[in-house]
Amino acid sequence: MSRYDPSMIEPKWQKAWAEAGTFTASMEGNKPKYYVLEMFPYPSGRIHIGHVRNYTMGDVIARHKKAMGHNVLHPMGFDAFGLAAENAAMDRGIHPKDWTYKNMDDMRDQMRPLGFSIDWSRDLATCDPDYYGQQQALFIDMMEAGLIDRKNAVVNWDPVDMTVLANEQVEDGKGWRSGAEVERKELTQWFFKISDYSDELLEALDGLDDWPAKVKLMQANWIGKSRGLQFAFGLVEPVGGHDRVDVYTTRPDTLLGASFVGISPDHAIAKQLESESEDIAAFCAECRKGGTTAAEVETAEKLGFDTGLKVRHPFDTAAQLPVYIANFILMDYGTGAIFGCPAHDERDLDFARKYDLPVVSTYVPIDDEGHVLPEDGGAAYVPPKPDPVRYIRGFAGEEIQSGNDAIDAAVTFCEAEGVGQGVTKFRLRDWGLSRQRYWGCPIPVVHCDACGVVPEKKENLPIELPYDVTFDVPGNPLDRHPTWRNTPCPSCGAPALRETDTMDTFVDSSWYFARFTAPHADTPTSKAEVEYWMNVDQYIGGIEHAILHLLYSRFFARAMHITGHLPRKAIEPFDALFTQGMVTHAIYKTTDAKNRPVYHYPETVDLRDGGGYLDDGTAVEIIPSAKMSKSKNNVVDPIEIIKQYGADTARWFVLSDSPPERDVEWTASGAEAAYKHLGRVWALCDRISEAARSVSEEAQPAAGEHDTALLREMHKTIRDVTNGVDSFGFNAAIAKLYAFTNTLQKSKASHKAQREAVMTLAQLMAPMTPHLSEDIWAHQGGDGLIADAPWPVANEAMLVESTVTLPIQINGKRRSEVTVAKDASKEEVEKRALADDAVVRALDGAAPKKLIVVPGRIVNVVI
């Protein structure tokens, strides 16, 4: 009998698929289409087990849909622009382009041995001029459609690297790379006007039925729709032409609890005061250090500066509130000013205690009968808005009412009194896309002294990045290139300058799904192809992309519809979304002489006696099931796994060990067990194949009850595996395949029935273990490639149970089982049980002392 050898099997079938063009997407025939897409990778140079799990899930879906008769589009590419390539250029003296293209070649070489059903003819990289040239064309179309704006914005500026930093790149107020104190700087930036679509993007979430509820909630919170009151506190003494402070609040019902007014360091009044006071200027400068996200501002220590200004309360002009400049107020939300109600906001309470400001309650908790309950004096009282409370300083609505009702009543009252107006605001801001970096898509505009800002002519696209740049000094190499910036104005022909900012890399990934439908077209999309293939039927990726990437893609799809590049049906581009769990692995740690942690690769640790040891006998601390991380060395190289066990083993294990939405822990023992199981499947199928060849058709016994039992289990397995794959229950489907393999191994059915079962087993395993399945199919004489074979269909008649399998106990211990007709008589069951091999061996010619049949339940043999 031959041995299961993935190193021989897998390359053979990969070559066969490639030569046959098996996975080249086609629009031919009267078939339904199916577009499955996994989020494309950044070309770091190495794939990891997380990639393997993600792409294997998509591959199972793609292969299954192909077998179900669909034209399948399953492409792959690279999200190839980004800061890492520039870092490589600075750290290692490698050009970003060379570094990126080598990494992409390496990753393709690592992905191909995994046997994914990818249409490699559609391979694209966002750093290819063919791709970003079409992105530039899209940008121009969006400019002309009024979807792009150019305006000033406050950014994180690294004065050493001379670049804008994302909020995530600011660490403790310093640039993550240079270590320089980050400045908040106002720069002219390009923006996509995504905020114009806030309400539409929010409302449309309700129609995304096949998206995880968690993702939709995260997007809804990010869009952040709120209903509130916008009004003004009048300044007691005007300053610099300002006589009021405009405030937006979502809790106007707490106005009578106000004890201070806070303004952002970037508020116009704060800027006026900066010019008049060195102390205020120093405080505002300190506030501008660090990140600009709401999350970072919320977690920072709350600091304020009493400006000495006072405002009048709109309901009690005799009452005056102090005005503070506060570091926790962002200029780009609301009006850049708030009133503080410490009794009902934890942040305001911290601030009030720090600066000895009054704390005045406007409402108190009550029980179900409306009786006042004691408050927790140590914390602000912030009940959920739907909960009823008793207002002790209310001014609108009922004395007992919910927060929601009180807010509505307060807005109505204030509008009637001429104190502001009710407004709806959104947290979502316009998408700033300007980056002062080289390795990105050039923004296709020209700055002309006579004409102003002018879009480049489309016939001049792509505007390609120059290769001859240097990274030996900080800043954007495009700014200092001797010739690249210089260009004639597209409008008047006079000497002009190119825009040197490049696009945020999120732009590149916000439309790639549409480009995959026609990756070689000379326009961003091709009408026939995009009409046929869109929408993406199944999108697969990590929950970490729930907000920015997915939200930006939803906006871009709308923009591309407006500019004529997508049909109306595609404004929500992803019909179904699945967010997979991570692959984890234990961490193996020791400490060095200075008690610093030292992390060890899994292959260097010997696991024995319940612990882990290095080659020299040093015991290691085992930290279980942590996210794989290069810094912790708890990573597993897929290429090494393929060399040791084969691609099918890696695929089988990442699918079988856990539900796909949960994390899966990679263990050597789990991989070994998966490999052994596939070896057993191979051996079983080889044995059945040999047995069938050794017996002539005429010599085979007629079909009997063993055949019926086996084929019945086969059809049940077809049903269960189909349901499992359709519902992303891959681990449940694999559990059914394990069970059916065991059934087949024990079966006494005819060779013909066993061969049919083997062929079906191969088809059901093909999406998960395509190479092994192809080999089994070929050995059993299957027609063509199993990758082209139709999916088996369960025979409904065979799913109706006409038999029952009863366990046989001998002296109280289960030893065997017997399958009989559901309506079999007691005598028939006894006869079949006494003929069972295990019972015959146990009796050894003697009669049983007692034989007990519990109909439909069990057979007990007492010896």
Swiss-Prot record:
Motif interval(s): 'HIGH' region: 41-51
Class in the EC hierarchy, top level: ligase
SUPFAM superfamilies with a match to the protein in the record: Anticodon-binding domain of a subclass of class I aminoacyl-tRNA synthetases, Nucleotidylyl transferase, ValRS/IleRS/LeuRS editing domain
GO biological-process terms attached to the record: leucyl-tRNA aminoacylation
Positions occupied by motif 'KMSKS' region: 627-631
Catalytic activity: tRNA(Leu) + L-leucine + ATP = L-leucyl-tRNA(Leu) + AMP + diphosphate
Entry binding sites for ATP: K630
Keywords in alphabetical order: Aminoacyl-tRNA synthetase, ATP-binding, Cytoplasm, Ligase, Nucleotide-binding, Protein biosynthesis
GO cellular component: cytosol
The protein's Enzyme Commission number: 6.1.1.4
GO molecular function: aminoacyl-tRNA deacylase activity; ATP binding; leucine-tRNA ligase activity
Pfam families: Anticodon_1, tRNA-synt_1, tRNA-synt_1_2, tRNA-synt_1g
Subcellular compartments: Cytoplasm
Domain of life: Bacteria
Family statement: Belongs to the class-I aminoacyl-tRNA synthetase family.
Name under which the protein is recorded: Leucine--tRNA ligase
Organism ancestry: Bacteria, Pseudomonadati, Pseudomonadota, Alphaproteobacteria, Rhodobacterales
Gene transcribed to yield this protein: leuS
